[in-house]
Amino acid sequence: MKTALLSLILFSCHIWAVKHQAKKCTEDRECEEIWPGSTCQRARCRCPENYVRRKSPSREWVCLSVNDAATGQVGPPLTCPLPDGAGYQVILRGSSTNNLLSPPVLCSSKTNDCETGYECIQGLSPVDGLDGACCPDQITTCAHPIFDHESGTLERWGFDGSECVKFKWDPEKPSSANNFKTKLQCESYCVNIFA
């Protein structure tokens, strides 16, 4: 059963990668599907203001928020794309408990030397000579649990295993990478890779 599921996942990712390989955009909608607020400029998707575009082995590209979602101030130099503005919460950590106090697993975005289920995303600035952190890849992101915070004030979308559902998010509380700004982004990340 595990082998069949792994084969399906790998085949789906291969089909997705072929469909999205170095694709040039022609309209904003194509970019918006991958990252909310992105626009098509000169046949290339551009991230919104206060975001930087970074290469993603599983998604082609992602946008990193320069600002922390909880404080609105400039965020840490290493972060993951999701949750938006709080990606530092889901960086792979160098301990068995994987808590925020453990050091992050650093990597080189040129070699993508992260463990299975993670990919190297170049940070906002290098740390200790390495330019990236190991972040959940597309499949791992979609497999993470949804952290629905009753006290949350921000509406978000998460993949529950079959569809994208709405929930409330509090950026000051622990979260997972399964946290999308829009339903379209959630579907693009999770639902559509198995379609």
UniProtKB/Swiss-Prot annotation:
One GO MF term: serine-type endopeptidase inhibitor activity
* Stretch forming the signal peptide: 1-17
- Provide the transmembrane region boundaries: none
Instruction: Give disulfide pairs as residue numbers.
Output: 120-190, 164-186
Q: Which InterPro entries match?
A: Cuticle_assoc_divergent (IPR053014), Kunitz_BPTI (IPR002223), Kunitz_BPTI_sf (IPR036880)
All copies of the BPTI/Kunitz inhibitor domain together span 120-190
Keywords (A to Z) from UniProt = Disulfide bond, Signal
Source organism, top-level taxon:
Eukaryota
**Which PANTHER family does the annotation name?**
PROTEIN CBG15282-RELATED (PTHR46339)
Q: What does this protein do?
A: Appears to lack serine protease inhibitor activity in vitro when tested with bovine pancreatic alpha-chymotrypsin and elastase. May be involved in cuticle biosynthesis.
What this protein is called in its record is Kunitz-type protein bli-5
By which gene is this protein encoded?
bli-5
